[in-house]
Amino acid sequence: MVEATAQETDRPRFSFSIAAREGKARTGTIEMKRGVIRTPAFMPVGTAATVKALKPETVRATGADIILGNTYHLMLRPGAERIAKLGGLHSFMGWDRPILTDSGGYQVMSLSSLTKQSEEGVTFKSHLDGSRHMLSPERSIEIQHLLGSDIVMAFDECTPYPATPSRAASSMERSMRWAKRSRDAFDSRKEQAENAALFGIQQGSVFENLRQQSADALAEIGFDGYAVGGLAVGEGQDEMFRVLDFSVPMLPDDKPHYLMGVGKPDDIVGAVERGIDMFDCVLPTRSGRNGQAFTWDGPINIRNARFSEDLTPLDSECHCAVCQKWSRAYIHHLIRAGEILGAMLMTEHNIAFYQQLMQKIRDSISEGRFSQFAQDFRARYFARNS
């Protein structure tokens, strides 16, 4: 796959347009130099410069317009400077469409040991070899530039959950100072400022007043898009939806809204109802490798013995290449035997299912029937467990 350099097209650096609305739900497009992203969008996670078990062309064939890369993992292995030397992340991995990179802040806190936070940034030991590293707003933006990211995320502090109001406030305030430093670092690089987009991240834990302060600070700095951070960290769906109900309306309406690290199909439907436009999550890839397939009738565990002679596809309504060719019985056998092909087929199906879900969401918003779609989706998805 030949890399499409950001300079080769007539498309804008970044342009978001909303084509239709229903309630708080919106559908539209993000135009960038490397391609158009249909929203609401689900971004498969390509942690280490690969969506695990899938070739880039397979990821694209599922309907994905954009993927996510992880700054933390790539800075440690193979290294951001090495990727830049080898032509950038798009060329390196053979994906010619947009890539969003996270800032590394979440992984630093969740994966590395002996982290030490200061106003400057975070020092930490690599989970791979124990080597010491420093990640600051400036270094995070530099790494994302070296990778050649299309959508760059501001560096933030991931507030632990649960947090007291005072702890959440001090964490949010530091994240806002880091957001300004991220903006300045991004703008200081002409190539990055002219070809990529920068998103800010709203923090404030579950507290409405802190979320409002954070949204106001981010809007004053100015970003191309706005993420809702600090959710999907163990608070549960009800609490997440409660926070989204008041948090999303605080963000600029004319910019994309990105819910980081979410989620299950029903999380996505509920978040779209609350005005979210972009999602990413490891769930379809990770759970696929472990034998969980997503279907319109809810998830199934393909390892279960009841599928050992089931000749039907993973989902009878799925249009993916896997469901056109292979049976539950065959994939059951592959997963039980630990065969690599099992992980490949399960992952491809799950990513395709998520993309078909997003297409149905977009179509139903466009046609003014999203609330009915959401109701029907939930009734069927949870019917087995009711």
Curated annotation (Swiss-Prot):
Catalyzes the base-exchange of a guanine (G) residue with the queuine precursor 7-aminomethyl-7-deazaguanine (PreQ1) at position 34 (anticodon wobble position) in tRNAs with GU(N) anticodons (tRNA-Asp, -Asn, -His and -Tyr). Catalysis occurs through a double-displacement mechanism. The nucleophile active site attacks the C1' of nucleotide 34 to detach the guanine base from the RNA, forming a covalent enzyme-RNA intermediate. The proton acceptor active site deprotonates the incoming PreQ1, allowing a nucleophilic attack on the C1' of the ribose to form the product. Belongs to the queuine tRNA-ribosyltransferase family. It comes from Zymomonas mobilis subsp. mobilis (strain ATCC 31821 / ZM4 / CP4). Its cofactor is Zn(2+). GO terms for biological process: queuosine biosynthetic process; tRNA wobble guanine modification; tRNA-guanine transglycosylation. It catalyses: 7-aminomethyl-7-carbaguanine + guanosine(34) in tRNA = 7-aminomethyl-7-carbaguanosine(34) in tRNA + guanine. Binds 1 zinc ion per subunit. The keyword Transferase applies. The keyword Zinc applies. HAMAP family: Q_tRNA_Tgt. Residues 261-267, 285-289 are annotated as: RNA binding. Gene3D superfamilies: Queuine tRNA-ribosyltransferase-like. The lineage of its organism: Bacteria, Pseudomonadati, Pseudomonadota, Alphaproteobacteria, Sphingomonadales. This is Queuine tRNA-ribosyltransferase. Its EC number is 2.4.2.29. InterPro entries: ArchSynthase1/Queuine_TRR, TGT, TGT-like_sf, tRNA_ribo_trans-like. One of its GO terms (molecular function) is metal ion binding. Substrate binds at D102, S103, G104, G105, Y106, D156, Q203, G230. Pfam families: TGT (PF01702). Zn(2+) binds at C318, C320, C323, H349. Pathway: tRNA modification; tRNA-queuosine biosynthesis. The gene is tgt. GO terms for cellular component: cytosol. Homodimer. Within each dimer, one monomer is responsible for RNA recognition and catalysis, while the other monomer binds to the replacement base PreQ1. The active site is at D102 (proton acceptor), D280 (nucleophile). Keywords: Glycosyltransferase, Metal-binding, Queuosine biosynthesis, Transferase, tRNA processing, Zinc.
